């Protein structure tokens, strides 16, 4: 009798634990963040293709798209372009691009985007005309409010000297942010020295003209927009009625996938203190941006990793990054076919690499695990909505 009673208690405890786990998963806020990096967007494009393919297999649905699984998708520069591609609706109100169309997009349009050089020493390297043309063609007249999930795309206004963050959740208070997606995408990609800044205007809540003078989102968030995406998710959880049950959002209630465009370990070995002690302004100017971006991206990842680990939620955060780019693959604007092939191979090879020295799990295995969480969470929410 005692044995039976103990067995029943054990079953109840298991069921309670399982129920609690699923309830927690159902309440998770899911966030996808995509770094900037020009043509190196091919690397996260390869990762997104793998992830979406896994979700389609798990849910037995060839039409499944990433926007169906993430509450917030954020990006800067080329990451902002990817964000728009997978969240902007087509005529059927589905993302106009599947993840497996991202890499072909770069192969088709990259050589033209990074080929229209102005030939001027004093001025941007590229005129940006083809970039704007293809963005208008692909994104049409779609505006922020039409995005299929919450987005967070950064830019920087050089007239007001302030960051500009385009999100759906800001529109009620700031309707002037409901800009056309092609204006936003060009702006977030308009890296100083590469493309001209972008001017456009919208209307305020009072109908007044509101002007933007924007450059690359990396100026506002550096290349890694993960913290920006997390802050947008936090605000949404606090303000959106659909998330009323989880307004006290913390990292335990968040699934965060952050995709990089690659860094180079060689950069750290390029210069010595003795050498740089002789440098002037021009020499520092050539490398300081790369140093700043590398340091900021590292610190963002370090901060997020530490926070998630301290909350015993390290499996809720996954940073996918190649840290050993070499040669032409380090360049943001080398759109030669040979280099794009190398970048695609970098993405494929990255899937087979371990997540870290301390974690032998490969990125492929980690992404499959992450996809399972996304799939289960979506099913739980669908079941709840059907009642």
Swiss-Prot record:
Q: Which domain of life is it from?
A: Eukaryota
Catalytic residues identified in the record: 77, 216
Q: Tell me which tissues or organs this protein is expressed in.
A: Tuber and stolon.
The residues that carry sugar chains are 115
Domain PNPLA per the UniProt entry, residue ranges: 32-230
Question: Pfam families attached here?
Answer: Patatin (PF01734)
Give the record's family classification: Belongs to the patatin family.
Please identify the protein, giving its name as recorded: Patatin-02
Source organism of this protein record: Solanum tuberosum (Potato)
